[in-house]
């Protein structure tokens, strides 16, 4: 790969990184305006990440156009820090979300979830009283449970439905309780349950109570968070590949000259030619 080809890669990788950052910011803003408070609280890190990546790209672009070795050094240093942070977070995300899955029940299409199946990190976060009060408030306001009776008119429809983890865990008692369903959001609690599961006593038909204090509800939230984290981890892998391409291509150019410093100056000169077409770059 020649110098021109490598510099071409740097320019286009920077452009792709900037476009990716803009897309991340737009997605974060969209999430903050089209979702309830439960998910909206997760959008700030998304917007912040997009803004930070955009800032890095601007630093690299200005460093090349203004022939500033200092800016290019800053660009490389910050880019390396971001790469390490993304790598660490992605590895931790895959480790934390490795455990936990749904359990099938005869006659039901949807799965049920058990809190102890998930990682100790999830258990610590969801068993924290202040955290759960906040999450429970969001779940009640979202009225997902109230909407079940409108979505599924009959018990047969409910049993054949693919309920979300939160609907399955927070809106109904665990199947082992044995409470007969009157409709999709109301159960006959006069039935004497022989199950030792404490969730059976915690469930109430009241809209603000349901099974929001149950471990099954926390397990449903854990499964939801696991899915979200996996998506973020996959996105981070793509982002890592894009950023590492930028770092490696910059390093390759640096190795073509008499050391990293001269390499950075050479990159800035070549890129400066595109930014200032009337200026003849100095040849090294």
Curated annotation (Swiss-Prot):
<feature type="glycosylation site" description="N-linked (GlcNAc...) asparagine">
    <location>
        <position position="99"/>
    </location>
</feature>
<keyword id="KW-0472">Membrane</keyword>
<keyword id="KW-0812">Transmembrane</keyword>
<feature type="topological domain" description="Extracellular">
    <location>
        <begin position="33"/>
        <end position="43"/>
    </location>
</feature>
<feature type="topological domain" description="Cytoplasmic">
    <location>
        <begin position="250"/>
        <end position="284"/>
    </location>
</feature>
<dbReference type="GO" id="GO:0016020">
    <property type="term" value="C:membrane"/>
</dbReference>
<comment type="function">
    <text>May be involved in the regulation of cell differentiation.</text>
</comment>
<feature type="transmembrane region" description="Helical">
    <location>
        <begin position="229"/>
        <end position="249"/>
    </location>
</feature>
<keyword id="KW-1133">Transmembrane helix</keyword>
<feature type="topological domain" description="Cytoplasmic">
    <location>
        <begin position="1"/>
        <end position="11"/>
    </location>
</feature>
<feature type="transmembrane region" description="Helical">
    <location>
        <begin position="44"/>
        <end position="64"/>
    </location>
</feature>
<dbReference type="GO" id="GO:0009734">
    <property type="term" value="P:auxin-activated signaling pathway"/>
</dbReference>
<feature type="transmembrane region" description="Helical">
    <location>
        <begin position="12"/>
        <end position="32"/>
    </location>
</feature>
<keyword id="KW-0325">Glycoprotein</keyword>
<dbReference type="InterPro" id="IPR018499">
    <property type="entry name" value="Tetraspanin/Peripherin"/>
</dbReference>
<dbReference type="InterPro" id="IPR044991">
    <property type="entry name" value="TET_plant"/>
</dbReference>
<feature type="glycosylation site" description="N-linked (GlcNAc...) asparagine">
    <location>
        <position position="183"/>
    </location>
</feature>
<dbReference type="Pfam" id="PF00335">
    <property type="entry name" value="Tetraspanin"/>
</dbReference>
<feature type="topological domain" description="Cytoplasmic">
    <location>
        <begin position="65"/>
        <end position="75"/>
    </location>
</feature>
<feature type="glycosylation site" description="N-linked (GlcNAc...) asparagine">
    <location>
        <position position="128"/>
    </location>
</feature>
<comment type="similarity">
    <text>Belongs to the tetraspanin (TM4SF) family.</text>
</comment>
<feature type="topological domain" description="Extracellular">
    <location>
        <begin position="97"/>
        <end position="228"/>
    </location>
</feature>
<feature type="transmembrane region" description="Helical">
    <location>
        <begin position="76"/>
        <end position="96"/>
    </location>
</feature>
<protein>
    <recommendedName>
        <fullName>Tetraspanin-10</fullName>
    </recommendedName>
</protein>
């Amino acid at each position: 790969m020649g110098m021109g080809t490598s510099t071409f890669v740097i320019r286009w990788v920077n452009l792709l990184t900037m476009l990716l950052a803009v897309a991340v910011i737009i997605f974060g803003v969209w999430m903050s305006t089209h979702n309830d408070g439960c998910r909206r609280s997760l959008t700030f890190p998304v917007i912040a990440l997009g803004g930070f990546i955009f800032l890095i790209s601007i630093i690299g672009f200005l460093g090349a156009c203004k022939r500033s070795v200092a800016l290019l050094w800053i660009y490389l240093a910050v880019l390396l820090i971001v790469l390490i942070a993304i790598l660490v977070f992605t590895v931790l995300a895959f480790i934390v979300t490795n455990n936990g899955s749904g359990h099938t029940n005869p006659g039901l299409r949807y799965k049920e979830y058990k809190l102890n199946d998930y990682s100790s990190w999830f258990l610590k976060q969801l068993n924290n009283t202040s955290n759960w009060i906040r999450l429970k408030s969001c779940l009640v306001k979202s009225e997902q449970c109230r909407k079940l009776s409108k979505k599924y008119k009959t018990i047969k429809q409910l049993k054949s439905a693919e309920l979300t983890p939160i609907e399955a865990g927070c809106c109904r008692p665990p199947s082992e309780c044995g409470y007969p369903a009157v409709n999709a959001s109301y159960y006959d609690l006069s039935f004497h349950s022989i199950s030792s599961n404490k969730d059976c006593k915690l469930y109430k038909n009241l809209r603000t109570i349901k099974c929001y204090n149950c471990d099954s509800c926390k397990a449903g939230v854990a499964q939801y968070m696991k899915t979200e984290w996996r998506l973020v981890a996959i996105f981070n892998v793509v982002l890592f590949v894009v950023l590492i391409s930028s770092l490696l291509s910059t390093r390759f150019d640096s190795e073509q000259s008499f050391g990293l410093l001269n390499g950075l100056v050479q990159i800035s000169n070549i890129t400066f030619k595109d930014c200032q077409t009337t200026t003849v770059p100095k040849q090294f």
